[in-house]
A protein has these predicted regions:
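Hydrophobic face of amphipathic alpha-helices that form TPR/SEL1-like repeat modules
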Residues: 78, 123-129, 187-188
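N-terminal alpha-helical interaction modules that lie
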Residues: 1-117, 127, 139-153, 170-176
Length: 188
């Protein structure tokens, strides 16, 4: 993991602190966009708790200590931090590379876990924007992003629709209600 202290989350407030059972109670709302399943492992729960209160560095460290089971929390914390809070361009790219590498490890260990593919694509996409799309395409990143997104979306489409409480839109005249906002902007 990238060395040095990360910038503090500038919007810290009590509403983002989910102590005890509050995290589980709010889980579906907080993870409506990514359909992340509730983790049984308490150390992974703690990593997510830290993520949701904006303690991104601690969340990443906690997720990594939990092993593969904590990679989703570590990767999401790192990717969201890098995208929204890291000011140094070189460090931002290094963080996205870390997420992509860990996501590849997780894909090998858990080949049917959709968020390993989604976070891989997200990290490579943001990395690509940082180095220029032309350079990224020359490195073959476009194909890797497409492959990961295909694997993330295709097998989970019904689950993701259920998680977001929407159904396929048969016509444009049927409104689909927006998801309630979680404590951070979500990338989807």
């Amino acid at each position: 993991m990238s060395k040095g202290a990360w910038s503090k989350f500038p919007y810290a407030e009590k509403a983002y602190i989910y102590t005890g059972a509050a995290l589980k109670k709010n889980w579906d709302r907080l993870h409506r966009g990514d359909a992340e399943p509730w983790p049984d492992d308490e150390s992974v729960q703690e990593a997510w708790r830290l993520y949701h209160q904006g303690e991104f560095q601690k969340a990443a460290e906690s997720g990594l200590k939990a092993g593969i089971a904590g990679y989703a929390a570590a990767n999401k914390a790192t990717a969201i931090y890098a995208n929204y809070l890291e000011k140094d361009a070189g460090r931002k790219l290094a963080l996205f590379e870390e997420v992509a590498r860990r996501a590849e490890e997780q894909q090998k260990a858990e080949p049917k876990y959709p968020n390993a593919y989604y976070l891989h694509a997200y990290a490579l996409g943001r990395y690509s924007q940082g180095i220029s799309v032309v350079k990224a395409l020359a490195q073959g990143l476009g194909g890797k992003i497409k492959d990961s997104l295909t694997k993330a979306i295709k097998p989970t489409a019904p689950r993701r629709m259920k998680a977001s409480n929407t159904s396929p839109r048969p016509s444009s005249s049927i409104p689909i209600p927006p998801s309630p906002a979680s404590n951070m902007p979500t990338p989807w």
